[in-house]
Amino acid sequence: AYAAKVRLDQIGSNDTTDTLTNGVSSRRNQLLMDISSELGVASVDGAAEATLDKLAQIVNKAAPNYKPVGAVLSEALRDRLRSLFGAAGVKQQYIRDRVANVWQLGEGWVASVLAALLLDTREGSSSRGGDLAKLPTAAVQNKPEADKLIDAAVEVVAQLKGVAVALPSAGGAA
């Protein structure tokens, strides 16, 4: 979604690296190199022609110990979080703590919220139509604004997963 300049909800299980790059071989080749770099493997055999469903299986075999985020996405994420949260002095650990401790959600949610902050705060148009952003794109200036953006990202992830979430009450659990 990041390299192809599309929203996650615009990618289908039958998409391939070719359809995501509109058949432009240089973009496809770059995407394949980025996938390999992200996973920390020399190459991902069969990735070029695989549907995303099949690619997920290939990736799980090629890099069974992969944990989000790898070399490629960590750089993009670091840059985006700096531009969104830098003025508020909020670092990635603060976001992790808010999702894990305040929302009381697991590590998978943390990774998904970070991905939403990367993907859903991009300005501009999707290559498949519509806006890229589902969340505000402007930098936050303080921690209350940061909390509001993080909370909105949690809600976007919940919507994508098709589940309801709510901030736990002071004495309760999620």
Where are these regions (language model features)?
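4′-phosphopantetheine-dependent carrier domains
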Residues: A1-A174
